[in-house]
């Protein structure tokens, strides 16, 4: 309902609702067909990321003339769940692999807060589905531009009990996608 109200009150907001949730990758594919504007920002509905940080990404894109801005997470809570260690190990490993293969210095390749210029966004063709799509668009973004910016963003992680869907096999698929997109 909140999004419908925004769409009604602001003509530059376009909302698309699906009958069945098929994940963020599917939503991004739909967005590629309908989105317009100068900048594209991906925001998860679960609000693990603070929407106030959108301004930080946008400021870097505009002032520093960056085509792609990716966040790197700062935890909003001091509560650490046991699986965070393994998640951070996986994210750090994926980030290291991406940086080695693509010659970048990204701090957190799994951060879901990303901003693209429209020109860059329309030239990215995600080659995967589900969670792999996220890594595919990052790989293609860094292949297509060297104008990359980064900024810290606040992050409040959910647990599996809270509805977190990311499991260990996502890391394996991401690893595969980073390699496949590099050599294709």
Located regions from the model:
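Acidic donor-binding segment of Leloir-type glycosyltransferases
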Residues: 1-16
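Cofactor-binding loops of NAD(P)H-dependent oxidoreductases
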Residues: 18-20, 45, 151-153
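Terminal low-complexity segments of carbohydrate-biosynthetic enzymes
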Residues: 2, 52, 176-184
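Acceptor/aglycone-binding surface of glycosyltransferases and processive sugar-polymer synthases
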Residues: 18-34, 39, 51-131, 157-175
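A generic structural signal for alpha->beta connector loops
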Residues: 10-13, 65, 103, 145
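Residue-level signature of catalytic and energy-coupling elements of molecular machines
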Residues: 31, 46, 117, 141, ...
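Catalytic donor-sugar/metal-binding loop of nucleotide-sugar-dependent glycosyltransferases
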Residues: 104-105, 127-129, 138-156
């Amino acid at each position: 309902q909140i999004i419908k109200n925004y769409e009604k009150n602001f003509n530059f907001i376009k909302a698309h609702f699906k009958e069945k949730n098929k994940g963020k990758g599917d939503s991004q594919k739909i967005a590629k067909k309908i989105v317009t504007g100068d900048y594209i920002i991906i925001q998860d509905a679960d609000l693990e990321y603070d929407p106030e940080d959108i301004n930080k990404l946008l400021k870097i894109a505009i002032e520093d003339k960056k085509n792609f801005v990716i966040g790197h997470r700062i935890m909003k809570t001091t509560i650490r769940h046991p699986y965070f260690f393994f998640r951070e190990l996986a994210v750090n490993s994926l980030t290291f692999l991406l940086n080695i293969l693509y010659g970048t210095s990204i701090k957190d390749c799994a951060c879901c807060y990303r901003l693209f210029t429209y020109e860059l966004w329309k030239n990215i063709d995600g080659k995967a589905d589900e969670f792999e799509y996220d890594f595919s668009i990052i790989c293609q973004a860094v292949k297509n531009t060297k104008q990359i910016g980064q900024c810290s963003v606040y992050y409040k992680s959910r647990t599996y009990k809270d509805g977190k869907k990311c499991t260990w096999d996502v890391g394996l698929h991401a690893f595969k996608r980073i390699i496949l997109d590099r050599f294709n």
